[in-house]
């Protein structure tokens, strides 16, 4: 029969489940998001390590096995355990282990005062209330009976004096810091406002300049359009006048046609092109006049005539 061993195993497993529940509930109360599987794995690893490394699990299971053997009529193990527990070497070993535990607690910052207070008192929470009940343990009762408890009023007064805080002084300091910060913020804000006003003024001035320049450009564009229209009209009237004058001349028809073609080729829409065309026409006329003059000059020489300009 292994009922005791099964009970011990159940208690150990229940302790592990309680540790997992305590860890997850603490994380939930603190508002920390967690992965249940990760918490379960970490707690199990730490729990198994502590139970195995400290020997607590093997100790509990060993005692459970001894109890089961005694229940089954095998008292040899129980007798050995009884003899071992009453042996002076065992007692010395237990004292040594206790001393090691005390030194370990001291190295972790848990001094004698804290250990004694934890051993003498326990705190009981009252459901639904913020207050608690302080309970004295049997050790505290024994100390009172032995006269080992005293009331130190000086310690209480000294502690109260140390914990006293001059809230008015702190409030004044915070108020001064707040006023100083408020002044700096106001100065920076006023500086930013001035800079923003200056930027707006510069922007409005630039907009006015741009508007004036746009008006001037519009006026110049209108003037250029009028000038271009006037030039187009002048060139058109010039071509018409030259054509009319050409028809009144006693020139051969082929010469008239050639000159008319050159006049009709003048671009009356673009004044720049029109000027180039007129220049080309004038050059051609001068060239024709020059050829005619050379022909006349040669003819006079062949006839033994001389010519002179008057």
From Swiss-Prot:
GO biological process, one term: regulation of translation
InterPro entries to which the protein is assigned, alphabetical: NSP3_N_rotavirus, NSP3_sf, Rotavirus_NSP3
Presence of keyword Coiled coil: yes
Region: RNA-binding, residue numbers: 1-146
Region described as Interaction with host EIF4G1: spans on this chain: 205-310
Chain intervals for the UniProt region annotation (Interaction with host ZC3H7B): 167-231
Chief place where the protein resides: host cell
GO molecular function: RNA binding
GO CC, alphabetical: host cell cytoplasm
Renumbered residue ranges of the record's region Dimerization: 147-203
Entry function: Plays an important role in stimulating the translation of viral mRNAs. These mRNAs are capped but not polyadenylated, instead terminating in a conserved sequence 'GACC' at the 3' that is recognized by NSP3, which competes with host PABPC1 for EIF4G1 binding. The interaction between NSP3 and host EIF4G1 stabilizes the EIF4E-EIF4G1 interaction, thereby facilitating the initiation of capped mRNA translation.
Family, as annotated: Belongs to the rotavirus NSP3 family.
Family matches, as HAMAP family: ROTA_A_NSP3, ROTA_NSP3
Subunit structure as annotated in this protein's UniProt entry: Homodimer. Interacts (via the coiled-coil region) with host ZC3H7B (via LD motif). Interacts with host EIF4G1.
Entry protein name: Non-structural protein 3
Species lineage: Viruses, Riboviria, Orthornavirae, Duplornaviricota, Resentoviricetes
